[in-house]
Amino acid sequence: SNDQTLEVTIYDSQKKVAQVTSKCANGSNLILPIKNIKLWSPETPHLYDISYCVKDAKGQIIDEVKSYVGMRKVHIANGKFYLNNEPYFQRLVMNQGYYPDGIWTAPTDEALKNDILLSKEAGFNGARLHQKFFEERFHYWADKLGFITWGESPNWGMNPDDEVASRNLLSEWIEILERDRNHPSIITWAPLTVPLSNVSSGTFARLVFDLQKLTKAIDPSRPFNDLTGSGFHFLTDIWSISTYEPDATRFALSLKPDKNQAAYANQPFIIGEFGGIVWETSRTKEDTWGHGGTFTNEDALFERIEKLINAIQSSGIISGFCYTQFSDIEQEKNGIYTYDRQPKFEMERIRSIFEKIPSRPIKK
C-alpha cells in the first residue's frame, strides 16, 4: 500500500545508532550509515540488533521483524585471504556434524553451541562444515561466538553425468545460499568435495561453471572454492589441496600447487585437509580408522602434529589449513575429541600447537 512505510532501525546494546524510513515498495535499497562502526571478527564478534517495522499512515505498527547483523568484509588479494582488510590465517577444523544418538541431527541447541566452544578451546578459529548443510542455529552460534566457517553441500559419490543429481544439487545450493548468505561467520562457499566420479568429464566442468555463476550471482561478496581439498580446480578463488602425508619432510614438499592441474593464478593457497591422526584408547581400539598410523604414545602424537604445523608455518605461501578432524564419527576415530565430545588430550597443549600460527600477522 502507498500509505505504508518501512522503518529500519539498528541498535548497539539497545542504543539506536541508525534509522531510515522508506515507502513500502519491492526492490527498494536502503542505506543506514553507522558512525564508528564496530566490525565482526572471531576475536571480537560484535553484532548489531536490527528491526524492520511496517507502519500504516497513522504510524501504527502493522508488522515487525527483529534480527541481527554483523559488519565485516572478506576478500582475496596478492595470494592472501583478508578479513576486514587485514590478512587473516584460517585455522580450520573439519566438522562433519555427526552425533552418537541422532547421527546427522544434533540432540540440542546447546550441543551445536558446545561444538564451537570446544573447537575454539582446541585452538581453531573456524571450521569446514563438511558434507552437510548445517543447522541454522549452528550458524547463529558461529556468528555469536566468533567462528568462521566454509559452507559446503553433501555430494559424496555423486555422478555429475547424472542430470537429475546435478539439477537437484543446483536447486539445493540456491536454497542454501539464499538461506545462509547473511551470516557473517560464513566466509567461503565450497559446494563440491572429492571423491566424485568423472571429475575430468565435460559435464563435470559444466556443473562447476554453473555452480560458480549461480554462487556469484546470488552472493558476490564471498570467495568460491570449486572442488575443496582436491588440488583439481577449474574455476576457483581459493586453491585448496588435500594431503595426509604423515612424514613432515614429504608433507612440506607437497605444499605447492600441482603443475599438472589448471594453471595456478596466485589464489590464496589453503590445505583443505591434513592430519587425520589416530590416538588409540580403549574406546577407539575397535574399528579404528585414520591416516598415518595409530599412536599409543601421547608425546609422539603431539610431536607429529607439531612438525606438520611447523612445515605449514615455514612454507611462506599457506593462507590457512583444515585439520581432520573435530571429533570421532562412526568408523573414523581420528578426532581431537571422542564421538561424545570428551577431550582425548591435554587441550592446552593441543591449542598451543595449532595457535603457533597466529590469525593475524604479528605487528613489529
Model-derived features: where do they sit?
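Secreted/periplasmic carbohydrate-active enzymes, especially glycoside hydrolases
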Residues: S1-W141, L145-G146, E172, I187-T188, ...
